[in-house]
Design a protein with these regions (language model features):
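Structured mid-to-C-terminal alpha-helical surface segments
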Residues: 1-160
Length: 160
């Protein structure tokens, strides 16, 4: 599914946001969690709980995506979750979910291989620039610094 929206930064540019879903995975690795959710409605704050996937599972599948494709948003999402998320994340739990999904596919990923893939991604101008038009102007993001951080705090936990 693709959404189109006008760029705020470049008024004559249309941005396309592709929403992807993996429909072959039917059962989550971790238990579904309930999360508080609130939104304004008619000058009141409505509060409820919604069910969703555990953050570590979502980041594990995001990590798998970065391993299997070249999209800068995957690095951004991992970096942002590790550094800015209001929900604390445990890098070891992310790795466990990542390895679970690779095992289901019959695939393995060692530390050196994944770091090599990320290093190659970071040499690609498109990979390093695809998030910029989507970010608010007050958000500073450096893909090279993000890559260094993700390697040190996440990928270094992978088996050798």
């Amino acid at each position: 599914m693709t959404y189109s929206a006008r760029s705020i930064i470049e008024p004559n540019r249309t941005l396309e946001i592709v929403v992807e879903a993996n429909v072959t995975e039917r059962k989550p690795h971790r238990a579904v969690v309930e999360m508080p959710f609130s939104f304004p409605f008619r000058d009141k704050a409505v509060q409820t709980h919604i069910k969703g996937f555990d953050i570590h599972e979502m980041l594990g599948t995001k990590m798998r995506a970065m391993f299997q494709r070249k999209r800068g948003r995957d690095l951004f999402d991992l970096y942002w979750a590790l550094t800015k998320s209001p929900t604390p994340v445990d890098p070891a739990a992310i790795i466990a979910s990542f390895e679970h999904y690779l095992k289901q596919e019959g695939t393995k990923a060692g530390r050196a291989e994944f770091i090599g893939i990320l290093d190659n991604h970071l040499k690609d101008r498109g990979f390093c620039s695809d998030m910029q038009p989507l970010l608010r102007t007050d958000i500073a993001y450096d893909p090279q610094a993000a890559g260094k951080y993700v390697k040190a705090h996440l990928l270094n936990l992978l088996p050798a």
